[in-house]
UniProtKB/Swiss-Prot annotation:
GO biological process, one term: translation
Job of this protein: Binds mRNA; thus facilitating recognition of the initiation point. It is needed to translate mRNA with a short Shine-Dalgarno (SD) purine-rich sequence.
UniProt KW keywords: Repeat, Ribonucleoprotein, Ribosomal protein, RNA-binding
Gene Ontology MF terms: mRNA binding; structural constituent of ribosome
Similarity comment: family membership: Belongs to the bacterial ribosomal protein bS1 family.
Protein name according to UniProt: Small ribosomal subunit protein bS1
Matches recorded under InterPro entries: NA-bd_OB-fold, Ribos_protein_bS1-like, Ribosomal_bS1, Ribosomal_protein_S1-like, S1_domain
Segments forming domain S1 motif: 21-87, 105-171, 192-260, 277-347, 364-434, 451-520
Name of the coding gene: rpsA
UniProt cross-references to SMART domains, sorted A to Z: S1
Lineage: Bacteria, Pseudomonadati, Pseudomonadota, Gammaproteobacteria, Enterobacterales
Pfam families recorded: S1
A cellular component term, taken from the record's GO annotations: cytosolic small ribosomal subunit
Length: 558
């Protein structure tokens, strides 16, 4: 009875071991080009594809006679052969290792080999695990290029074989390794200390440095005295650097580091080293839309504003003048030590065309140039040196209003003008066209003395004045109040527009360029006809009406 029970038990064990999916022991019988023959003590030897025995480098790490674990795929495949799998057995072994590591909180070796949503994938002996982004390190890590492809230690924090789900943490390993070292470092750490560290990670705002169990932040503004666009300009991941502890918050375990603080501040007493108007050479480090930055010494940069790049083009883009790494000559315009700002000038190291023009073109000098533009207030003329001069509307003609006189000019016309004024500081040149000729007003009053009797033509009138056209395109003014005191309303009404009239020069207003006239006094017999001989037969009722009103107004005043 006992023998029968023992026999049945042994047979049942064999049956369990030979069920599909079970792991059994086998011996390598032979190794062929494409297949490996394995004897697992079953009905027949099984051929397993050689690829299942290759390592990650594609090499075989077995030899004939080795005993290995294999998974039983099928006892009978329909052709009388048993199917075995080395690959499934290795995967089973890998899961056992992970389960053991998870239970005992041991580390496993894996390789980060890809990025997925929320984290990364890790290869653990043919098992694909998930590494959350927050568990890569004790500090946030955006870029894992320096970690990918390397064998790293991880801790298994979640395991579910049925769902094929494995979650690992690298952060847990680091925290465990650093705990003792970290405690000692935190105890000894003091502000102002000089320490060594290894750059672990770079961000847009700085670099995280491992001080030996404790990470510190080296902010981008504390990397160098000069302006730094990105931390990679100063340090790289893996660099061992000397740094200074700037601030240490023990409660929050936060450490602020400084690299530039290891050296002297180059901004101290910089105004003494570089007084205003000092000329020096520097290297262009960066271009912007508003100017370029020039390094004048290690850690010190100044800004050449776009307005200080070229004398004649105020809106030129910096890239049209300089390029990065150009060595240029600049002038110190202003230094603000408190705000650590230096204003530099590029154009100040070149000839100032405005100053040069002022030295070679005094008032009254004639110039020749093409019209560059015509505006509501005047004409701009291009001059030598790439600068412009302005002819104001009031300086186009002596006798014709500027708005009318400017009409005969057009862009690109070559014209002459006279220099009226040069303001090199404000970069302004005033020119005149009418000054090319004598002022007809001055000429006229020079040739005609007060009291001279001349002939004019009535041009227009209002309730106060009669405007009289004179020779040389000049005009004179007769005040109606002067007329009504001498002549009757009937006589006044004889006057008509375009009538020739004898007038006497009364006075000159040089400032306002006005010639005042009076009607020439004549004998009583001659008052019948105030006007000079004329063929004008035109009656002007409006003129007569105005004269009548003016006459009445004058009488009422009396």
């Amino acid at each position: 009875m006992n023998e029968s029970f023992a026999q049945l038990f042994e047979e049942s064990l064999k049956e369990i071991k030979t069920r599909p999916g079970s792991i059994i022991r086998g011996t390598i019988v032979s190794i062929e080009k494409d297949m490996v023959l394995v004897d697992a003590g079953l009905k027949s030897e099984s051929a397993i594809p050689v690829e299942q025995f290759q390592n990650s480098q594609g090499l075989l790490d077995i030899q004939v006679g080795d005993q290995i674990d294999v998974a039983l795929d099928a006892i009978e495949d329909g052709f009388g052969e048993t199917l075995l799998s080395r690959e499934k057995a290795k995967r089973h072994e890998a899961w056992l290792i992970l389960e053991k590591a998870h239970e005992k909180s041991e580390t496993v070796i894996g390789i980060i080999n890809g990025k997925v949503k929320g984290g990364f994938t890790v290869e653990l002996n043919d098992i694909r695990a998930f590494l959350p982004g927050s568990l890569v390190d004790v500090r946030p890590v955006r870029d894992t290029i320096h970690l990918e492809g390397k064998e790293l230690e991880f801790k298994v924090i979640k395991l579910d074989q049925k769902r094929n789900n494995v979650v690992v943490s690298r952060r847990a390993v680091i925290e465990s390794e650093n705990s003792a070292e970290r405690d000692q470092l935190l105890e000894n750490l003091q502000e102002g200390m000089h320490v060594k560290g290894i750059v672990k990670n770079l961000t847009d705002y700085g670099a995280f440095v491992d001080l030996g169990g404790v990470d510190g932040l080296l902010h981008i503004t504390d990397m160098a005295w000069k302006r730094v666009k990105h931390p990679s300009e100063i340090v790289n991941v893996g660099d061992e650097i000397n740094i200074k502890i700037l601030k240490f918050d023990r409660e929050r375990t936060r450490v602020s580091l400084g690299l530039k603080q290891l050296g002297e501040d180059p901004w101290i007493a910089i105004s003494k080293r570089y007084p205003e108007e000092t000329k020096l050479s520097g290297r262009v480090t960066n271009l912007t839309d508003y100017g370029c930055f020039v390094e004048i010494e290690e850690g010190v940069e100044g800004l050449v504003h776009v307005s200080e790049m070229d004398w004649t083009n105020k809106n030129i883009h910096p890239s049209k003048v300089v390029t990065v790494n150009d060595v240029v000559e600049v002038m110190v315009l202003d230094i603000d030590e408190e705000r650590r700002r230096i204003s530099l000038g590029l154009k100040q190291c070149k000839i100032n065309p405005w100053k040069e023009f002022s030295e070679t073109h005094k008032k009254g000098v004639h110039v020749l140039g093409k019209i560059k533009s015509i505006t509501d207030f005047g004409i701009f003329i291009g001059l030598n040196g790439g600068i412009d001069g302005l002819v104001h509307l009031s300086d186009i003609s002596w006798t014709i209003p500027g708005e009318e006189a400017v009409v005969k000019y057009k862009k690109n016309d070559e014209i002459s003008a006279v220099v009226l004024q040069v303001d090199a500081e404000r970069e302004r040149i005033s020119l005149g066209i009418k000054q090319l000729e004598e002022d007809p007003f001055n000429t006229y009053i020079a040739n005609h003395k007060k009291g001279a009797i001349i002939t004019g033509i009535i041009k227009s009138l209002d309730k106060k004045n009669i405007i009289v056209k004179l020779p040389e395109n000049l005009e004179g003014v007769i005040k109606l109040t002067e007329i009504t005191r001498v002549y009757s309303e009937t006589m006044i009404n004889k006057l008509k527009i375009e009538d020739k009239i004898l007038v006497k020069l009364s006075s000159f207003d040089r400032k306002n360029r006005i010639i005042y006239l009076t009607i020439h006094m004549i004998d009583e017999d001659e008052k019948k006809d105030l006007t000079a001989p004329s063929n004008n037969k035109t009656n002007d009722d409006s003129f007569s009406n105005v004269m009548t009103e003016a006459f009445k107004a004058a009488k009422n005043t009396e």
